[in-house]
A protein has these predicted regions:
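Cleavable N-terminal signal peptides
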Residues: 4-6, 16
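Ser/Thr/Pro-rich low-complexity tracts
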Residues: 17-113
Length: 113
């Protein structure tokens, strides 16, 4: 009986090293546009609890974007003035938490002339 109680208690206990959810972008609409174009990024774990900042990156330069709206599955932003026409950027997220990380996303946006 005592063994059964210990076993149930062990199985019900949360893991000692629970990992924070990782933000992930799965799509951006539209996929191209001019500076000033509003974009909607969809994915998971995109709320303020997990995402501190959003960037466009070409692998050399990172351009911070202003997040206008944000919830668990969407972020709305505008393509900033520093973006260069003709460049196809990846989205990049700065996470929150004890150990913030910059994570490049598999989602791209092309800035039009």
């Amino acid at each position: 009986m005592l063994l059964a109680a210990l076993l149930v208690g062990t199985l019900a206990a949360p893991p000692a090293f629970a990992q924070e959810p990782i933000p992930r972008c799965t799509a951006v609409e539209p996929m191209s546009g001019k500076i000033g174009t509003e974009i909607v990024v969809t994915g998971e774990n995109l709320d303020k609890q997990y995402v501190a900042k959003l960037y466009l990156t070409d692998g050399q330069n990172d351009i911070e974007m202003v997040i206008k709206e944000q919830d668990a599955t969407t972020m709305k932003s505008v393509i900033p003035k520093g973006a260069k026409p003709g460049v196809r950027y990846r989205l990049m997220i700065l996470t929150r938490g004890k150990e913030p990380k910059l994570i490049e996303q598999p989602v791209r946006f092309e800035v039009e002339e």
